[in-house]
Each structure stands twice: as structure tokens, then as C-alpha cells.
């Protein structure tokens, strides 16, 4: 599984910590960060890279997470969630089949960020009754 990472200048330090953590866990990392671009361009780069292949997940980090969430959910086929706790990160994979999360570096500290990322990348999609919701989400954008 490849994990696509992106950040703007406000989220880059936390993104680098997340990157190191994921590399230690032996995940394939594709970092599409352009430190000179704002969160919109970096979020689009992450979301597009995630949508290029099945089995990819994306993580975008900026100051608060809200802006990248809004950008990502504008794209066809992208189910994303703004998260600031481990349980939400895990559950958005299980119930919503989210392929991307956004994190705010001014909200989430280093250890919590690692736990959020772990929950997201290890959380399986439950399917079943949740597939109806996922199909509805995919039709919207």
C-alpha cells in the first residue's frame, strides 16, 4: 500500500514526522509536497495521486485541516475526512471507506498524529451496510 503525503508550510514539520513514522512501519511513501504552494495545490496533488491507483491512501497536513478537507471532497471519487483523534481516523476507514484524511498541525501534536495515522492506515473497510453510504458519497462529486 502506498501512502501519499502532502503539506503546506504550516504542516510540513508534522508531515515529516508522519513520514518518518510510516517509513519505520515499512509503508511505501509518495511525498507530493511543494513547500512553496498553498494548501489547495498540495491537497489537489495528494487527492489526484490517491485516485490514480487502488490501494492508495492520502494524508494532507496544514495548520487546521479544514481547508484541505473542503478541497479534497470537491473531487470525484474522493472520500475524505478531517480528523483530530484516533477513533475518528479508524472509523472513517471502517464505515466511510475514506481514502484521505486531513490533519491540522496546530491542533494535533506529534504523538497523537502518529496514533491518528496508525488508525487510518490499519483500519479496514467494513463494507456491508456501509457500502450504501459509500455509494451515495461517490455519486455526489
Swiss-Prot record:
Reaction equation(s) it catalyzes = aldehydo-D-galactose 6-phosphate = keto-D-tagatose 6-phosphate
Keyword Chloroplast appears in the UniProt entry: no
Please give the Gene Ontology molecular function terms for this protein: galactose-6-phosphate isomerase activity; ribose-5-phosphate isomerase activity
Pathway assignment: Carbohydrate metabolism; D-galactose 6-phosphate degradation; D-tagatose 6-phosphate from D-galactose 6-phosphate: step 1/1
Family matches, as Gene3D superfamilies:
Sugar-phosphate isomerase, RpiB/LacA/LacB
Q: Which InterPro entries match?
A: LacA (IPR004783), RpiB_LacA_LacB (IPR003500), RpiB_LacA_LacB_sf (IPR036569)
- Enzyme Commission number(s) of this protein: 5.3.1.26
Keyword field: Isomerase, Lactose metabolism
GO BP term, example: galactose catabolic process
Q: Which family does it belong to?
A: Belongs to the LacAB/RpiB family.
Subunit: Heteromultimeric protein consisting of LacA and LacB.
Record-linked HAMAP family:
LacA
Can you name this protein?
Galactose-6-phosphate isomerase subunit LacA 1
What organism is this sequence from?
Streptococcus pyogenes serotype M3 (strain ATCC BAA-595 / MGAS315)
Name the encoding gene, please: lacA1
